[in-house]
Amino acid sequence: MIKNRKIGHVGLATNDIEATVQWYLEVLGFEVIGDFKNPAGAPIKFLKRGDIIYEVFQPIGGATAPGKIDHLCFESGDIEADYQYCCEQGYTFEKEGIQELPTVWEKGARFFKIMSPSGEAIEFCQVM
């Protein structure tokens, strides 16, 4: 079992990132704490209110299910060890291997996602 992991953020896919972000700011009092683009140029914004962090992103080509929570992210202090453990347990991965996202935060992030039995993605992410 992967223990003692803090929830890092909840990922939300949208087809209109500006309207979605504005709604969270005005209606729920969130603030923007990160404004990035992925390597393909698609926008990603991190919003925070108290201990809650949302990653709002607009995939190129549109969200497959806009408004649906895309993933739940847990922080990782050792992404390689967590990935190895999940491999040993035989979990189903969204994509094989540890993914890198160099365009977020100061030094980028590394992550992988496993799939739950009901289909949601569970992400483990290490900010570099």
Give the residues covered by each predicted segment:
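N-terminal beta-strand motif that seeds the catalytic metal site of vicinal oxygen chelate
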Residues: 1-19, 70-72, 76, 125-128
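Vicinal oxygen chelate
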Residues: 1-3, 87-128
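Core segments of cupin and vicinal oxygen chelate
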Residues: 2, 12-53
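Short amphipathic alpha-helices within nucleic acid-binding modules
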Residues: 23, 80-85
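Short amphipathic alpha-helices in soluble, non-transmembrane regions
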Residues: 26-27, 85-89
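Short, solvent-exposed loop/turn elements at beta->coil junctions and helix N-caps
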Residues: 35-37, 59-61, 98-103
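Short beta-strand micro-motifs in enzyme catalytic cores
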Residues: 43-45, 70, 108-112
